[in-house]
Swiss-Prot record:
It is an enzyme of class 2 (transferase). Substrate binds at residues 28, 283. The keyword Methyltransferase applies. It catalyses: histamine + S-adenosyl-L-methionine = N(tau)-methylhistamine + S-adenosyl-L-homocysteine + H(+). It is found in: Cytoplasm. Its main location: cytoplasm. The keyword Disulfide bond does not apply. Monomer. One of its GO terms (molecular function) is histamine N-methyltransferase activity. S-adenosyl-L-methionine binds at residues 60, 89, 94, 142. Its EC number is 2.1.1.8. This is Histamine N-methyltransferase.
Length: 291
């Protein structure tokens, strides 16, 4: 990343603001929910067969909305089983929101929540240091592998925790998405070298293929309205640009040349389609399910 530009994740408040706006402007949650309710139940039906207690790990759980939907589907497939749910999330605000959501919900008596305010890497270090032997029946890592140094090693570690019938669910942006094109073009300019911000499911699949690993994969069509990005000085447009580039205050810190190039690419058919005066960015997600 160019020295004048800082990573968006260095400012938790602005990151959360831009992330919430991204969710409002995109069909991300809807397409993930459709997958959870229409495809995931059959996958969950095959985990922990006959067990009366299931171990779940949510890595990068955020504010918990998606976690609770997954746990609800798991419960419908294994109604008699109690669940031990490890929540791994480094943001204090997100964890607070998750806990508040749990308090609002009824019928969660079958779940015990273990709150881990830490990164995936810190969780792995603690797990290894304590020589934990507990196996997981289901692990989900949704939109979080961008924030680790080595996504392949993180994937391998969590896969190693699975029980015999356990499954690991990974959701990231698809290699065929606008993100894939954007990151391929500008990885060196605005991706933080300390983490793997520019990783897509195509990268993870290449790694798994090189190991000869078996997995299922799915593509989830999604769009994001980025029209506001093209109005100079628009506050929401600037937030969306920060989220797209993962650069803090991108419009103010990028050179005019880089900004112009990025804006041109965002409008390019490889990244977006224009419809009814709106610019709709290809936000397709990829899903990988590992045994």
């Amino acid at each position: 990343m160019a020295s004048a530009m800082r990573s968006l994740i260095e400012d938790d408040s602005r990151y959360l603001k831009s992330f919430k706006l991204f969710l409002e402007r995109s069909t991300e949650h809807q397409c993930v929910q459709e997958f959870i309710h229409n495809v995931l139940p059959d996958i969950l039906g095959s985990v922990g067969k006959g067990k009366t207690h299931l171990n779940v790990i949510g890595v990068g759980s955020g504010a918990g909305e998606v976690d609770l939907e997954i746990l609800s589907e798991l419960h419908s497939r294994h109604p008699g089983a109690s669940v031990d749910n490890e929540v791994v999330e480094p943001s204090a605000q997100q964890l607070q929101d998750y806990k508040a959501l749990v308090l609002q919900k009824k019928d969660l008596d079958y779940i015990s929540f273990n709150w881990n305010k830490m990164t995936a890497t810190e969780f792995e270090e603690r797990w290894r240091a304590n020589k934990m032997s507990k196996e997981a029946d289901f692990i989900h890592m949704i939109q979080m592998l961008y924030y680790v140094k080595d996504p392949e090693a993180t994937t391998s570690f969590f896969q190693s925790l699975l029980s015999k019938t356990g499954k690991l669910l990974i959701i990231l942006v698809s290699g065929n998405s606008g993100w894939g094109k954007l990151w391929k073009t500008y990885k060196n300019q605005f991706c933080n070298p300390e983490i793997s911000q520019c990783v897509t499911t195509a990268d993870i699949q290449s790694f798994l293929d090189s190991k000869g690993a078996r997995y299922q994969s799915f593509e989830l069509p999604s769009q994001m309205d980025i029209t506001e990005c093209f109005t100079q000085g628009d506050e929401k447009g600037e937030l969306l640009l920060d989220f797209l580039t993962e650069v803090l205050e991108f419009s103010k810190t990028a050179s005019p040349e880089l900004r112009a190039e990025v804006m041109e690419l965002l409008r390019h058919p490889d990244c977006s389609v224009e419809s009814n005066g709106r610019v709709m960015f290809n936000n397709n997600l990829g899903v990988i399910v590992l045994d």
